[in-house]
Amino acid sequence: MLRNSLFVAAAILGVATVHATDIDSYTQGIQQWHAGRVERLTAADGWLSLIGLEWLQPGANRVGSAADNDIVLTAGPAHLGVVTLATDGSMRIVLDQDSHATIDGKAVSEAVLVDDAHATADAAPTKVAFGTASFYVIDRDGRKGLRVKDSEAPSR
């Protein structure tokens, strides 16, 4: 009888130990995932840096932080430039001379914009950067929008 009781006690203790190890491993996995998620969210271009989504209209769209623009941004120069959305869905940007913006890290005055739906493994969507903010074009069922991010957004 004592022998059976010892066997049952040892079996229960063994299961509890294995179970505790599994829980510790599971908890550690959750904590690692959580830390990685927070890091991705708070990154300079993470989701918490999102400050705007502005839909483009066909034709010329004046973009900047001044109230007289077609698309008013919450960050950046008063007059950033003009984004033109053609009837075939192609887009082009012409930057204002005083915008001090870059396109894909280069100081150019105009460029064709590639949206996220037409990006490839070798070519990301075109990124227009100005100060701590930037935007790239998204395509949602044929609608084109500017996804605007700021690395200094209060939400980060």
Predicted regions and their residues:
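Bacterial N-terminal signal peptides
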Residues: 5-16
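Structured catalytic/translocation cores of nucleotide/phosphate-coupled proteins
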Residues: 11-12, 20, 122
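Surface-exposed beta-loop interaction hotspot
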Residues: 131-156
